[in-house]
A protein has these predicted regions:
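N-terminal signal-anchor module of multipass membrane proteins
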Residues: 1-55, 61-64
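Membrane-interfacial loop-to-transmembrane-helix junctions in polytopic alpha-helical membrane proteins
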Residues: 2-10, 42, 75-81, 108-117, ...
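Hydrophobic alpha-helical transmembrane segments of multipass integral membrane proteins
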Residues: 9-19, 23-26, 30, 58, ...
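Intrinsic disorder/low-complexity signature
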Residues: 22, 145, 152-155
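Conserved catalytic-core motifs characterized by acidic clusters
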Residues: 47, 148-151
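Membrane-interface helix-loop-helix modules in multi-pass inner-membrane proteins
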Residues: 52-123, 137, 141-144
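Short aromatic-rich membrane-water interface segments that cap or initiate transmembrane helices
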Residues: 150-166
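Conserved small/polar residues in nucleotide/adenosyl-binding loops
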Residues: 169
Length: 170
């Protein structure tokens, strides 16, 4: 087995680990305002992921770093082509993290309801965009001879990718 294959397997394991662990967190965040009807039950659902939710992002950061180190052209093409989608994904993750922290800062029902819905949005958007990204990678993205992505953000939202985003949420 050559070094490229070993790196590819390592990066794949890191992404699979991230999606496996983070998928549970996304699911809790998406279902949180829909299934938990009172504040006590909502607190319990948040506590199921509260101790380790932020540690799961280490997997994707490590995968991105390994991709940058082992396959810089792949990294540059992927991140420049999916730049807008990844920035929206990042905003969703920030909203999600802030909602975990700010929800408990005030006991007002309106305040908590706001952050419960921010947790929903901050979990749904990244799950949807990860589905779009993975579906596009499986389908294939337009890359020119210089390894530059030649599509736009809305080219990523093709029917196959939109099916993939729904599958990632489910």
């Amino acid at each position: 087995m050559d070094l490229n294959t070993i790196w590819f397997i390592l990066i794949s394991v890191l992404f699979v680990g991230f999606f496996f662990l983070e998928g549970f967190d996304y699911g809790v965040g998406i279902l949180h305002p829909l299934l938990s009807k009172d504040d006590k039950k909502r607190r319990v659902t948040i506590n199921t992921i509260g101790t380790f939710w932020d540690g799961n992002e280490v997997w994707v950061i490590t995968a991105g770093g390994a991709m940058f180190a082992a396959f810089p052209h792949w990294y540059a093409t992927l991140f420049s082509g999916f730049y807008i989608a990844l920035m929206i994904l990042l905003v969703g993750l920030i909203v999600r993290g802030v909602s975990f922290e700010f929800r408990s800062k005030d006991k007002s029902p309106r305040w908590r309801n706001l952050w419960d819905w921010m947790l929903f949005v901050g979990s749904a958007i990244p799950a949807l965009l990860w589905g779009v990204a993975v579906a596009n990678l499986i389908r294939g993205v337009p890359i020119d001879e210089n390894m530059n992505y030649v599509g736009g953000f809305f080219n990523l939202l093709n029917p196959y990718a939109l099916l993939g985003d729904r599958k990632s949420v489910v």
